[in-house]
């Protein structure tokens, strides 16, 4: 069991939070009969803290274990570094959640993080291999744009899947969508033509999009109200890692034109990984309660003003984001004469730092304003990506990095707004329908640039579409501020079995101990 030992010179003052049972954002304690402090609530599976007087002061000894699935080792490692400082200050971490997470919530977040990684890999396959795939089939940049536009029609799959999540449950549709996307990857691996690839990825990308909407819904429905953007930001990191893992394999595409097929065969492993990661994932309690209400119970409807405002934001943003992100590899290969290895290096070095924007944006969104975080991110994404397509040499690398870091600030804020703005039994359908507007923007953007790329080039074309995401800031201003508000209060929703219309973590019925008792023999 991990152990942290710190020394405090002299006695602890009465005002020092460590002198008694802690009640902080990290852990809630009670004092045991032997004088030590046992954790009763918090993200740790086991927690024991005791103070031992010495000749020169006080030794604080903490025995803990997160016991979290899949990522517990990382949490334990980070805790060893951060816990002594954070407990001494008794303040929330600059980069951590603003609320105390229960062990159940932390476990769910870890399971969703693994599923996000799988979804990220599946989603990144076609976008990062399309240029090589099209070259193997002898297709042009215009044909790639056409294929991407057709693949976007998979939003119909997304809308159906998210709507079913309101009826059949979040868990069932999340796992089912990842299974279907993995099968689509296997079909792509053996596809005889570009047309078959397009059809397979139409289904695959639509299924990945289902998971991309359902995972945030699960987390927003389970997390405390001041930590929802934090949770979305945390999930964005393994999703980005999944996309980055695709880049690890790009150098093998230099071996032969058909080497891209090997990357899609990973679908076999992802089916097994999905089964492993999802076996202990539970349904959200908000969905369970809402699903068991009497048929006569009134479920709030979607607020039309909110739907239009967030929908127009997504549409205008994607007119720019889809072409610049999807055709970036082709630009580097054709315009800058990069090899597959150099493309992978460029994307890794410029995109890896996006985690800074994700974490920073989530803190702004939770502690200040969702709309400010989203606005800053959209502006940074537009500026950075436009400059990247209009620069050469090191300025191109810097511009791409700026676009990745600042642009990532919008991920956790928009990702939280999408579930927050709609009631429980309408949340999936509303998000799936919004995907139609986002895809409409993507298709419009891809068709706008399709012919212009071959005639006027990438630089002038990106400057032409750069105004659209800036226009997206206008409808964003009309959205309500959701930071720090309960989902029930935001949507005028009553879930009687949860206790009130301002549901907090403790109101959701934690019917199991958040922290398990520590075996005293394990402390020796």
Question: In which residue ranges do the predicted regions lie?
Answer:
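Hydrophobic-ligand binding "helix-grip"
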Residues: 11-68, 77
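Extracytoplasmic gate region of multi-pass secondary transporters
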Residues: 126-131, 305-358
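Helix-breaking motifs and short loop linkers at transmembrane-helix boundaries and internal kinks
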Residues: 138, 169, 190-195, 224, ...
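Central cavity-lining transmembrane alpha-helices of secondary-active solute carriers
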Residues: 148-163, 212, 348-360
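Structural signature of the two symmetry-related core transmembrane helices
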Residues: 172-186, 372-387
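Cytoplasmic helix-loop-helix junction between adjacent transmembrane helices
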Residues: 200-235
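Glycine-rich segments within core transmembrane alpha-helices of 12-TM secondary carriers
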Residues: 227-250, 254, 270, 435-445
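Symmetry-related core transmembrane helices of the 12-TM Major Facilitator Superfamily/SLC fold
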Residues: 260-276, 461-478
């Amino acid at each position: 069991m991990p152990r942290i030992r710190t020394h405090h010179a002299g006695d602890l003052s009465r005002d020092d939070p460590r002198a008694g049972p802690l009640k902080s954002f990290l852990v809630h304690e009670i004092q045991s009969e032997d004088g030590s402090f046992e954790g009763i609530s918090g993200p740790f599976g086991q927690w024991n803290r005791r103070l031992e007087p010495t000749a020169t002061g006080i030794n604080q000894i903490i025995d803990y274990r997160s016991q979290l699935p899949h990522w517990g080792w990382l949490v334990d490692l980070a805790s060893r570094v951060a816990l002594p400082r954070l407990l001494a200050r008794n303040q929330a971490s600059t980069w951590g959640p603003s609320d105390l997470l229960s062990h159940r919530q932390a476990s769910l977040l870890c399971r969703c993080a693994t599923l996000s990684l799988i979804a990220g890999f599946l989603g990144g396959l076609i976008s990062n291999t399309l240029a090589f795939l099209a070259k193997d089939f002898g297709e042009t940049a215009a044909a790639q744009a056409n294929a991407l536009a057709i693949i976007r029609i998979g939003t119909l799959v997304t809308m159906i899947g998210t709507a079913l999540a309101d009826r059949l449950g979040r868990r069932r549709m999340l796992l089912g969508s990842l299974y279907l996307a993995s099968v689509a990857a296997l079909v792509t691996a053996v596809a005889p033509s570009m047309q078959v690839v397009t059809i397979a990825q139409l289904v695959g990308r639509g299924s990945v999009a289902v998971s991309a909407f359902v995972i945030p819904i699960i987390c927003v429905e389970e997390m405390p109200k001041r930590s929802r953007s934090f949770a979305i930001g945390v999930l964005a990191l393994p999703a980005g890692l999944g996309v980055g893992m695709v880049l690890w394999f790009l150098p093998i595409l230099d071996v032969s034109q058909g080497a891209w097929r090997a990357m899609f065969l990973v679908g076999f492993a992802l089916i097994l990984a999905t089964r492993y990661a999802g076996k202990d994932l539970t349904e959200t309690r908000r969905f369970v309660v809402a699903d068991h209400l009497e048929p006569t119970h009134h479920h709030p409807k979607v607020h039309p003003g909110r739907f239009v405002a967030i929908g127009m934001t997504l549409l205008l943003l994607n007119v720019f984001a889809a072409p610049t992100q999807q055709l970036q590899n082709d630009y580097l290969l054709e315009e800058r004469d990069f090899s597959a290895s150099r493309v992978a290096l460029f994307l890794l070095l410029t995109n890896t730092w996006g985690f800074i924007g994700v974490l920073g944006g989530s803190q702004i969104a939770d502690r200040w304003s969702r709309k400010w975080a989203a606005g800053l991110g959209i502006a940074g994404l537009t500026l950075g990506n436009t400059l990247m397509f209009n620069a050469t040499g090191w300025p191109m690398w810097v511009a791409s990095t700026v676009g990745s870091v600042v642009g990532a600030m919008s991920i956790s804020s928009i990702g939280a707004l999408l579930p927050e703005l709609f009631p429980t039994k309408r949340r999936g359908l509303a998000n799936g329908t919004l995907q139609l507007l986002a895809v409409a923007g993507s298709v419009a953007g891809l068709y706008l640039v399709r012919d212009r790329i071959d005639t006027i080039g990438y630089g002038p074309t990106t400057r032409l579409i750069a105004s659209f995401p800036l226009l997206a800031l206008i409808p964003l201003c009309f959205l309500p501020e959701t930071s720090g508000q309960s989902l029930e209060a935001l949507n005028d929703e009553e879930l009687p079995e949860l206790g009130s219309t301002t549901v907090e973590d403790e109101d959701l019925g934690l019917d199991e101990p958040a922290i398990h008792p520590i075996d005293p023999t394990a402390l020796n």
